[in-house]
Amino acid sequence: MQYPHPGPAAGAVGVPLYAPTPLLQPAHPTPFYIEDILGRGPAAPTPAPTLPSPNSSFTSLVSPYRTPVYEPTPIHPAFSHHSAAALAAAYGPGGFGGPLYPFPRTVNDYTHALLRHDPLGKPLLWSPFLQRPLHKRKGGQVRFSNDQTIELEKKFETQKYLSPPERKRLAKMLQLSERQVKTWFQNRRAKWRRLKQENPQSNKKEELESLDSSCDQRQDLPSEQNKGASLDSSQCSPSPASQEDLESEISEDSDQEVDIEGDKSYFNAG
């Protein structure tokens, strides 16, 4: 089979079979291999003209542009070096060296800050806000439970002052420290005195009943506990003067209202 020799017009318009033809062809075509694009090797010399043969003209037109179809072909030879640098930066091994999605790494950093482990080894979320001492509120004050408050109020209605054995027994029953019971009674007496000053007539009967019940309870105690108590038989009289003596001798506590701070030994034990 004979192939006609392509003319100059056919060579200029001819389309290679393996790669698209550049829009602007240089005077001396340069093969676009990977080595040439990345600038790793010298440019291949222009093939020397040979005698016309049935396939020589077709081969001379196709061989300089025989390049893999997945490699991009530059539009203009003046941009070949710039495109080579861009390709090396985009498709090189160091082009994607950094993390594509830094958000999971940031979440992990925050997760370590939010997740902590308690002494038992269980993870807790937002532990700085959840791990708080029992009945502890802002300012270092203790918030008593409803049951504890009810029992303390019942005890205060019948007895305004507590002896050390009574304070110890009440603290053990309510699972509180003696210091907490002592301070609660101190604050409660301060509040009671303020109410008494505002309405002194309505509190006289309550004071007498409280004094009588306190004397009756102390007389029923064993002799050893009566020794530790600070009440005398002369103080168990319904007169107001004897009650003032009772308040001055039964306890060394002041009646100034103070904040109840948590007992560290009690909370650690609990």
Swiss-Prot record:
It comes from Homo sapiens (Human). CDD domains: homeodomain (cd00086). Recognizes the DNA sequence 5'-ATTAA-3'. Transcriptional repressor. Activator of WNT-mediated transcription in conjunction with CTNNB1. Establishes anterior identity at two levels; acts early to enhance canonical WNT-signaling by repressing expression of TLE4, and acts later to inhibit NODAL-signaling by directly targeting NODAL. Inhibits EIF4E-mediated mRNA nuclear export. May play a role in hematopoietic differentiation. This is Hematopoietically-expressed homeobox protein HHEX. The gene is HHEX. Interacts with CD81; the interaction prevents nuclear translocation of HHEX. Interacts (via N-terminus) with SOX13; abolishes the SOX13-mediated inhibition of WNT-mediated transcriptional activity via competitive inhibition of the SOX13-TCF7 complex. Interacts with EIF4E; the interaction inhibits EIF4E-mediated mRNA nuclear export. SMART domains: HOX. Residues 194-270 are annotated as: Disordered. It is found in: Nucleus; Nucleus, Nuclear body; Cytoplasm. Residues 222-241 have a biased composition (Polar residues). Residues 137-270 are annotated as: Required for WNT signaling induction.
